[in-house]
Swiss-Prot record:
Organism for this UniProt entry: Anaplasma marginale (strain Florida)
This protein's pathway: Protein modification; lipoprotein biosynthesis (signal peptide cleavage)
Chief localization: membrane
Family: Belongs to the peptidase A8 family.
GO BP annotation list: proteolysis
Keywords: Aspartyl protease, Cell inner membrane, Cell membrane, Hydrolase, Membrane, Protease, Transmembrane, Transmembrane helix
Subcellular location: Cell inner membrane
Role of this protein: This protein specifically catalyzes the removal of signal peptides from prolipoproteins.
This protein's name: Lipoprotein signal peptidase
Amino acid sequence: MKSKIVGVIAIVLVFALDQVSKAYAIDWYSQSGATEIFKFCSLVEVWNRGISFGMFGALESSNLIFTYVSLGVILMLFVLFVQSKCNKSTICMGVVIGGALGNLADRLRFGAVYDFISLHAGEFHWPAFNFADVCVTCGVICFLCLEVMYHAKACVDTSGDPDALSVKKY
């Protein structure tokens, strides 16, 4: 139960930080335009109607399609979140859900996701992203690492028989 509370806090915190960071970036951009923060990082303004890296943004009705897809993914993740028995996985899913909700809120309010962080080195420019994208990416990576670690130690011989395996919960 405690992990569920921490997971819900993660959802709310990530969502709130994402929305605040976007509001700040929108305000900053409207006053100052694109701004180099570090030699490799700039504040920019990109309205992304597609998915990762702007893919499929030119599709007719892309916002409607991706809004429904986002809702479906968030609902699926929330079901997994509620059913999860692993504290660490619950927190990872909370971070992912919070980020996904942040981007969904943009789609519903603006018709596109607001991206404002641009990483670059010389002529190389990584596609713009936002705080929610970072949280979704980090949450998924942490969740996958936990799954790999869990499955690596999940099968334990309890009887001395190499064919007799049982699942060990951590």
